């Protein structure tokens, strides 16, 4: 039986849930939807992208340790460039500028406060 497969929701390990929530909200434009330091987990979103932020105590039984790498697939080279410009104007920790890679991805990388990485990309192999 075929099922419509939903988007994955990555768990991002952080050391300070309140500081991480503020960074994702203020610098990267996410919304903190629920949770926080008291729960050890928070749900954040931006458009159709959803993620969980979790602190050390919450992760203790599960073994998810930083840093992690998350790929964010956008719909065009222009969207990648626009998001880079937006995040460059904030205090986002830009690791690399947008670049067309030999493997046919136009991408840049940003880090959070804990060194987790986000590679923002567009696959231009079919353009």
Tell me what each language-model feature is.
Residues 31-66, 117-122:
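Conserved short beta-strand elements that form part of the metal-binding/catalytic scaffold
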Residues 10-12, 33-35, 99-100:
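Short beta-strand-to-loop elements that line the ligand-binding cleft
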Residues 26-33, 89-92:
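Conserved acetyl-CoA-binding loop of GNAT-fold acetyltransferases
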Residues 40, 102-103, 124-127:
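A short acidic/small-residue loop/turn micro-motif
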Residues 2-7, 15, 38-51, 109:
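C-terminal "cap" of GNAT-fold acetyltransferases
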Residues 1-21, 68-72, 123-127:
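N-terminal beta-strand motif that seeds the catalytic metal site of vicinal oxygen chelate
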Residues 15-18, 70-117:
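Vicinal oxygen chelate
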């Amino acid at each position: 039986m075929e099922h419509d497969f939903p988007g994955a929701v990555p768990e991002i390990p952080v050391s300070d849930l309140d500081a991480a929530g503020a960074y994702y909200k203020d610098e990267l434009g996410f919304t903190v939807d629920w949770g926080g330091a008291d729960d050890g987990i928070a749900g954040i979103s931006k458009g159709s992208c959803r993620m969980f932020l979790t602190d050390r105590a919450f992760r203790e039984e599960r073994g998810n340790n930083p840093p992690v790498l998350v790929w964010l697939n956008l719909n065009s080279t222009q969207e990648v460039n626009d998001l880079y410009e937006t995040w460059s104007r904030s205090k986002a920790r830009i690791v690399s500028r947008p670049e067309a890679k030999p493997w046919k991805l136009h991408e840049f990388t940003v880090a959070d406060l804990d060194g987790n990485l986000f590679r923002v990309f567009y696959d231009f192999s079919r353009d």
